[in-house]
Amino acid sequence: MTFVERIKYFLISVDFSISKSFLFSQSRFSKILKDFIYTKLYLLRNNFTIILGKSDLNDFEIPKETVFHTKYSKCYLYKECPEILKKIIKDHQNKIENYLGKNFLFEKVMYYETFNLPEILLKEDVYSNIWHMDSHDGNKLLKIFILLQDVEDNDGPFVYLDRLSTKKNWRKLVNRWTFDKKFLNYDYDEQKKFLGKKGDYLIINTSICSHRASSPKVSRKMLVIDLFPRWTKNNN
């Protein structure tokens, strides 16, 4: 590693450390600052209230092909946004625009199915099944999750904490990969499970709310879309 590379590594480490130490975030401080500036510039809301809703999936077909398949998960990436997601976005467009701004972007519309993990892998990060936050693009993003089947406790529900609960438990959540996360079982009194009927959906900012997948007894199917403000991503 050259001297310049060491300096760059140091600056990136500091960028992350500021956010972890003072902002309860796993994102880089420079990206959070950018989000803050644009939020003020466009007079957007700082907070987004988690939304739970219901949709009609009668005309939705689960894709028969996959683009990524492992022993424990598989996914299909859509080139176009499915109509069911367009309707949900339209139903909540004002709230989404007040938070992300107008002309927000979507990325990675995905059908995702997870399968049962053997006990030896439950503490390994196989398919985001340890507590984490989506830290790659600042702290302004929304994810919409739609259940493609009825989900109960043994169906591997998505598990999450709201923002206040994330802050409250930050000492244990500050890093994604740590020794104690691998060898201790951290559940939280405040955690919530996304249980429900086929077609139920959840809208949440996964960059500020800690969350994880859980292992189903057999499998669990969901449809997922990421929404970003237009200053975060190139629209291509």
List each model region and its residues.
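N-terminal auxiliary "cap/dimerization" subdomain that precedes the catalytic jelly-roll/cupin core
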Residues: 1-105, 196-197
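Non-heme Fe(II)/2-oxoglutarate
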Residues: 2-14, 19, 23, 36, ...
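A general structural signal for short secondary-structure junctions and capping/turn motifs
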Residues: 41-42, 133-138, 150, 192-195, ...
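Conserved hydrophobic/aromatic beta-strand scaffold that supports enzyme active sites
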Residues: 48-50, 143-147, 191-193, 201-203, ...
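Short loop segments at secondary-structure junctions
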Residues: 54-55, 148-152, 164-165, 228-231
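Active-site rim elements
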Residues: 81-86, 186-191, 212
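Conserved double-stranded beta-helix
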Residues: 92-161
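Double-stranded beta-helix
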Residues: 153-209, 232
